[in-house]
Amino acid sequence: MNVRDFDFHLPEKLIAQTPLKDRTASRLLVLDKHTGAVEDKKFPDLLQFIEAGDCLVLNDTRVLPARLFGVKEETGAQVEVLLLKQMEGDRWETLVKPAKRLKVGTIIRFGNGELTATCVQELEHGGRVLEFSYEGIFHEVLDQLGEMPLPPYIKEQLDDKDRYQTVFAKNRGSAAAPTAGLHFTEELLDQLKQKGVHLAFITLHVGLGTFRPVSVEEIEEHEMHAEFYQMSAGTARLLNEVKRQGGRIIAVGTTSARTLETIRQEHDEFVETSGWTSIFIYPGYEFKGIDGLITNFHLPKSTLVMLVSALAGRENLLNAYAHAVKQSYRFFSFGDAMFIYDKKTNS
């Protein structure tokens, strides 16, 4: 398939730059993947479509405030550091700007010197391995000095770091938020549980590769980035029981969907497991793990649009997106949501 098959017109004014004051104030476009019919709803209306016995699967990853601004100890030149992946001990794979003049042995100071980093290895594409030194607990120092690594299409500053975290964020490690989860409040989660809906949690640490554009014409040639995922024994048991009882498994976000599909591609049922996934889902893929999906509106020609097209059908999805544009839905990380399901299975 050609990458242009997943292109669509998107006015720049529809790219949400800031989150809404109330998490649940977002709109919800409901798409019947069987018929292609759409309905315009508010996010709390999700309660009308999720039945007792169904299970929502949420990604409990926590975004690191992974963008740091420091100065070279020797020259005072300013440096921007983006943490990508923790290696052994206090060593991290990072992206550094400007990278050209940051050589092995260079020391960077952050804040008032409570955090320093030494370059220990040069990598490709501006990457550097930095070894950090600090007093106390690294993540507490990072919380004080770091900024949220917002996606490149968001130009506004974020006033409240917590608005780029889900209310159930728990396990640190993401470079970006699992944005479908941003719409949920504790109150809405409680209402779902009171209705008899199960809540299950997985972890997938979102990498910056999620924003990497597809650079090939034929999408089958695209290579996905790898991301760490984990499923507990308790979650696996719950999901298998939901399946046995005839309930639907609804992934909250493409990260949850990719985790569930990765596990079901490798096993006959859900199991306790962890590892790295580079699963690439596009039309023609046969879903084994999920029955529905709650997700935000994604970038043209992105792997996420391809994933959602695989579930909803490409024409259904592009028609729904055209409707969303016409109705001025808000797009991308701080935007509105859609719920994709098959009405035939909705009792």
UniProtKB/Swiss-Prot annotation:
Pathway: tRNA modification; tRNA-queuosine biosynthesis. The keyword Disulfide bond does not apply. Pfam families: Queuosine_synth. InterPro entries: QueA, QueA_dom1, QueA_dom2, QueA_sf. Keywords: Cytoplasm, Queuosine biosynthesis, S-adenosyl-L-methionine, Transferase. GO terms for molecular function: S-adenosylmethionine:tRNA ribosyltransferase-isomerase activity. GO terms for biological process: queuosine biosynthetic process; tRNA wobble guanine modification. It is found in: Cytoplasm. Monomer. Transfers and isomerizes the ribose moiety from AdoMet to the 7-aminomethyl group of 7-deazaguanine (preQ1-tRNA) to give epoxyqueuosine (oQ-tRNA). This is S-adenosylmethionine:tRNA ribosyltransferase-isomerase. It comes from Halalkalibacterium halodurans (strain ATCC BAA-125 / DSM 18197 / FERM 7344 / JCM 9153 / C-125) (Bacillus halodurans). The lineage of its organism: Bacteria, Bacillati, Bacillota, Bacilli, Bacillales. The gene is queA.
